[in-house]
């Protein structure tokens, strides 16, 4: 879940006018760190997968896939404007 939240709110590649990467290392690439995460409330909905043994589904990918879209959708509803890009930085939200 932390990875999905980090993808949604801060991770991005930035390039200069020559096309060179301005965020080439972890010092300049903005990852979420321990203590910067919100408290999560998690609920699971069981929907078996018909095409797999015992109806199992992948577990670890759900937070990565759903959280950026869910956060963008919630902020879009709150601001009353369509959000079509990530990351959802404070600067980007201010410009809405």
Where do the protein language model's features map onto the residues?
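C-terminal catalytic domains of large/alpha subunits in multi-subunit enzymes
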Residues: 1-96
């Amino acid at each position: 879940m932390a990875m999905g939240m980090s993808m949604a709110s801060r991770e991005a590649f930035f390039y200069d006018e020559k096309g060179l990467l301005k965020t080439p290392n972890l010092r300049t690439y903005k990852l979420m760190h321990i203590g910067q995460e919100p408290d999560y409330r998690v609920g699971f909905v069981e929907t078996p997968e018909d095409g797999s043994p015992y109806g199992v589904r992948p577990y670890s990918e759900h937070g990565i896939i759903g959280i950026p879209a869910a956060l963008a959708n919630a902020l879009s509803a709150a601001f009353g404007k369509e959000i079509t890009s990530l990351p959802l930085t404070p600067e980007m939200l201010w410009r809405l």
